[in-house]
From Swiss-Prot:
Belongs to the universal ribosomal protein uS12 family. Residues 1-21, 34-57 are annotated as: Disordered. The keyword Lipid metabolism does not apply. Part of the 30S ribosomal subunit. Contacts proteins S8 and S17. May interact with IF1 in the 30S initiation complex. InterPro entries: NA-bd_OB-fold (IPR012340), Ribosomal_uS12 (IPR006032), Ribosomal_uS12_bac (IPR005679). It comes from Streptococcus mutans serotype c (strain ATCC 700610 / UA159). Keywords: Ribonucleoprotein, Ribosomal protein, RNA-binding, rRNA-binding, tRNA-binding. One of its GO terms (biological process) is translation. It comes from the Bacteria. PANTHER family: 30S RIBOSOMAL PROTEIN S12 FAMILY MEMBER. This is Small ribosomal subunit protein uS12.
């Protein structure tokens, strides 16, 4: 344990908080070709690869994912939520933060019902999370 004098000479360092979704905290000025510190809640990108991957140990499934090149030129892996999707290579998608616990390296979600991504069909409950319109009564 340090003495008061040691703390006066060299105070304690505060912990640096690390972002859960770092690609959303970087902007890009295409005019000057420089990265900026412009944070955003969502970002637009182009899907460069769409596929499935298997989750970590206790779970078993084929989870859908897309490799996305964002508007700030960073490439990330994003999860495609819901049952069924219409994404393919060169689809324009909107991503938000939020990791998938059993997929290593997947820190982003694709927003359903935005840009080229269609909402989940035949969904009755929790529709807003999956971009589904209200069914006709």
């Amino acid at each position: 344990m340090p003495t008061i004098n040691q703390l006066v000479r060299k105070p304690r360092k505060s912990k640096v908080e690390k972002s859960d979704s770092p690609a959303l905290n970087i902007g890009y000025n295409s005019h000057k070709k420089v990265h900026t510190k412009l944070a955003a809640p969502q970002k637009r990108g182009v899907a460069t690869r769409v596929g499935t991957m298997t989750p970590k140990k206790p779970n078993s499934a084929l989870r859908k994912f897309a490799r996305v090149r964002l508007s700030n030129l960073i490439e990330v892996t994003a999860y495609i939520p819901g049952i069924g999707h219409n994404l393919q290579e060169h689809s324009v998608v909107l991503i938000r933060g939020g990791r998938v616990k059993d997929l290593p390296g997947v820190r982003y979600h694709i927003v359903r019902g935005a840009l080229d991504t269609a909402g989940v069909t035949d969904r009755k409950q929790g529709r807003s999370k999956y971009g589904t319109k209200k069914p006709k009564a």
